[in-house]
């Protein structure tokens, strides 16, 4: 085998190993937390805190628990749109205690790298049939700090 051929084979072997390493590095480990344990995680704590602030009508304080991007989007809304959004959020919000109860009953928090997603799915049955209510909230994680991003 000529020197240039050996170099080409070695180079392609190295490149294939490098691409495998990069692919493996891109996949962050996934952690799933369920029920009451979510309330001990920074994302669970910020979720409950923000819900309580919204329920109490403290929207400016609640907004401080969101990512910079969300805060900028909020500032970009017209006063009329912000008023409409705050009305809808307050109407759909729950007390901290009720929201914590929902998380304990059916919450699932998935952490992947510096991102998190909380999903709460509740099934309801009555004389008219059944329905499912699903709430999803996304987070950006920086160390032990968790901010709502969607």
Residue ranges, per PLM feature:
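Bacterial N-terminal signal peptides that target proteins for export
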Residues: 1-10
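Bacterial N-terminal signal peptides
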Residues: 12-19
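Sec/Tat signal peptide C-region and signal peptidase I cleavage site
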Residues: 20-25
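Short, low-complexity N-terminal intrinsically disordered segments enriched in polar/charged residues
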Residues: 26-56
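Hydrophobic pocket/interface hotspot
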Residues: 50, 62, 139
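Short, well-ordered alpha-helical segments enriched in acidic and aromatic residues
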Residues: 58-74
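Surface-exposed, charged secondary-structure patches
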Residues: 83-132
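Short beta-strand edge/turn micro-motifs at domain boundaries
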Residues: 129-150
């Amino acid at each position: 085998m000529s020197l240039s051929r050996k170099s080409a084979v070695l180079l392609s072997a190295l490149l294939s190993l490098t691409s495998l390493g990069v692919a493996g590095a891109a996949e962050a480990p996934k952690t799933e937390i369920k029920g009451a344990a979510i309330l001990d995680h920074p994302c669970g704590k910020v979720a409950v805190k923000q819900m309580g602030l919204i329920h109490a009508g403290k929207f400016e304080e609640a907004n401080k628990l969101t990512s910079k991007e969300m805060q900028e989007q909020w500032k970009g809304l017209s006063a009329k749109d912000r008023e409409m959004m705050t009305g809808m959020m307050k109407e759909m919000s729950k007390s901290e205690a009720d929201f914590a109860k929902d998380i304990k009953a059916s919450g699932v928090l998935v952490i992947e790298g510096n991102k998190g997603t909380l999903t709460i799915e509740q099934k309801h049955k009555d004389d008219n049939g059944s329905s499912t209510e699903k709430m999803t909230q996304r987070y950006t994680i920086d160390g032990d700090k968790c901010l709502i991003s969607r």
